[in-house]
Design a protein with these regions (language model features):
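Short S/T/G/P-rich N-terminal loop/turn motif that feeds into the first structured element of a domain
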Residues: 1-91
Length: 91
């Protein structure tokens, strides 16, 4: 199961941290071990790490976002144009 790390900017870090939307959107995909990160020098820059059982489904959720994904990102104050996703790779 690959680990995925995404980072992006948010409008309100405390709101983003407290939001249940990550679990609501990613939980049904089987995503587990969700961890959040904040840049201590610029708290509007945040990251989230996941263990993802179906990478194709996960990446597809961002490539062709459904209304619930768009609504969750808007609710959380995510600035989608700043989103970068990294996928764990091992030699």
């Amino acid at each position: 199961m690959p680990t995925v790390f995404g980072y992006h900017d948010v409008k309100d870090t405390e709101h983003w941290l407290a939001s249940p939307k990550r679990e609501e959107v990613f939980g049904p995909m089987g995503v587990t071990n969700i961890r959040t990160f904040v840049n201590p020098q610029d708290r509007t820059k945040v990251g989230v790490m996941f263990d993802v059982p179906d990478l194709r489904q996960f990446m597809g959720a961002f490539e062709s976002p459904q209304p619930e994904m768009i609504e969750a990102m808007q609710h959380d104050g995510v600035l989608p144009e700043t989103l970068v996703i990294l996928v764990e790779e091992r030699p």
